[in-house]
Amino acid sequence: MNRKMQVAALLGATMLGTSAWAQEIDEIIVLSSPFKKAATDVISTTEILTAEDIEGSISGPLGNLLDSLPGVSSAGYGPAVGQPVIRGVGGYRVDVMQNGMTIGDISSTSGDHTNTMSLFETEQVEVLKGPAALRYGAYAATGVVNGFNRHLNADTEEGTDVLVGFGDNADETITGIFTRQGQFSLSAFSQDADNITIPTHGESEAYHEREEAEAGDDGDDDHELVDGEQEAANTERENFGFTAAGHFGDDETKLSVMFSSSEIDYLIPHEHSDHEGHEGDDDDNGHAGDDEDDDHHEEAGGADISLEQQTFHARLAHNGAVGPFNSFRADLTSTAFEQTETVEEEDGIERSEFEQDSLHLRGEFAGIFNDWNTLVGLEYRDIDLTAPDHEHGDEDGGNDDGEEEHGYLPNTESTQYGLFVFAEHEGNDWLTEAAIRFDEVELEAAHEEEDEQDDDHDHEGPVSFTLTNISVGLAKKLDDNLLVGGSVSSTERAPSQVELFANGEHHAVGRTEIGDEELDKESSLSTELYIRKAWQNSQMRVAIFNNDYSDFVFLEETDTHGTFNFVQADAELYGYELDYQTDLKLGGRLWNASLSYSSVTGELSDGDNLPAIPADKFGFGIGTSFNAFDVKLDVEQVADQDDTGEEELATDGYTSVDISASYQPPAYEGLTLNASIRNLTDEEIRQHTSPLKDKLPEAGQDIRLTARYKF
């Protein structure tokens, strides 16, 4: 602790020598907007990360990149997984897309499944809320995370981009190359990282105390936490992928095609499914061995998740008259996805496989009618998920006992048809946005014959939902620099295949999940008020929101240890977000500074707290440029989270400090050298949104070096 305090004091004294760039949002075009408007002219709340913002987080999961944004958090499951959480919810309420189309992975089906978006190829990421989000489908009720792949951008400049990097925390290496020549582009990216190093014991003190209390006087269950830097077993990860793209046609009509292939292999800490209290192998998070002098032990097995994905994306854009419309765009995405999970249980190996084929089609017509910019779209999605019965074998992976059990999910097929209209109008200092969307969603599971009479699966045939979503936003420009407005959205969401059909043990996460085919559609009435102000070299955004849910779907633990049911209850989430950015002139130098604060509260109708609601967080950044150097400092302070759900432990707050400096040698045009330190003070960081928060903290101090050459 003394070292942390000394470093923090030093940073406070020298703060003005470092920086964090303020985002010039008024100069950034919102690509997710159908009409490509500036962020200041879009009523829907939008957060934007540019290529410069993304560059420092290429190696991390998507959630880690977004975590610094107001109202956005990450639900991590080890260093390879970070699912985005928007205003307290994620999963099937937040649609993660690439260029407005489905990615085709299975990250939403479980917290341990990673997202496959390639950040190396991504030139901009947008978090979109409000009316414009309805453009993107029935599972975008809370928001959309939309990444834009530079391969699909027909205007990407010609040239080559080469990246090499190293991170000392996990002996991580990354390499990447992107080249665009004429109308064709090609890229490849690889990452290899060993186990992460954490600043202290894997178990949180609160979890350890509860486990010790439950264990009682059983001496075999006693073990001490080791407070010191140690390696976290079962946190390795590898990633390799390549992409090729081409553009054909002219400025009026253009066909763009892109093919990508990726392979990801990562380990996650695993708790044995029959674990109840400390059994001598409870340190499945891989730290703090009981009888070894090493910093870690590997007595407990991990879950090895390997996935492969191939995606084909085609886009036809016509910038000319099509009947009464001014332009037309059609997108097609076809994805083949495979994932294998291998888990070391005490009595052998458990292996589960997932295969998913998905097809996504969207056609959009844009035009102007009575001074209203209007977009009319049609959408079709078909997802065929095959989840074969998992195998139980010996330690060598052989299925020597011939035992097969039903998998976590049955084979399922889901189909969605959508029709949507989005319109906006600007006049007399008023901005208006309106959207309406109709969806027909059908989901069907192929249950085993012997289960047809099971009470859990007494529904025959497909489950269908008819959804109507409406959103309206209105804003007033009080002057050229002040915008006040709000939006109201009525949304409906169909339960997912997991929430409906799950019926078994998900070995990778060590719990049994039971779906309910009788679940109703989830509905929400969302309201938001905001103010945006710009003056001189400063700008401020404040948003207040409330989401009132009917039949909110969530997991609830049963009386049987390790078994969870998907249930429904009314719920409410509300909070606020603040973002302030300014330019300062200090010591004859221009500084960019930013402040942010966000808070969200989630409650069930009976007054109980919703689980995994992120804690309040405060962010601060300051930075400057001089000669060929850019330097920056980012500080994030997260409060304690004591408003916990049933059986959920409180999470201590933390303060994380990141610093970085980049240098562009004048003699080597196109070369950028970057040095950064993440978690400078080696803070114990536990995200309340993470299912592993009480088993594994975030990585400790990480010194990173990268070199990037563009020519």
Task: Give the label of every model feature segment.
Residues 146, 155-156, 163, 180-306:
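Periplasmic-side early beta-strands and strand-to-turn transitions of outer-membrane beta-barrels
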Residues 27-55, 83:
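N-terminal periplasmic "start-of-domain" segments of outer-membrane beta-barrel proteins
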Residues 272, 336-338, 395-398, 442-458, ...:
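Surface-exposed extracellular loop regions of Gram-negative outer-membrane beta-barrel proteins
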Residues 102-129:
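Short acidic/polar hinge/loop motifs at secondary-structure boundaries
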Residues 168, 294-315, 354, 412-414, ...:
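Outer-membrane beta-barrel signature, preferentially recognizing the C-terminal barrel domain
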Residues 233, 251-327, 335-358, 389-412, ...:
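Flexible loop and strand-edge segments within Gram-negative outer membrane beta-barrel domains
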Residues 63-105:
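Extracytoplasmic beta-strand/coil segments of soluble accessory domains associated
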Residues 426-432, 537-549, 553, 558, ...:
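Gram-negative outer-membrane beta-barrel transporters
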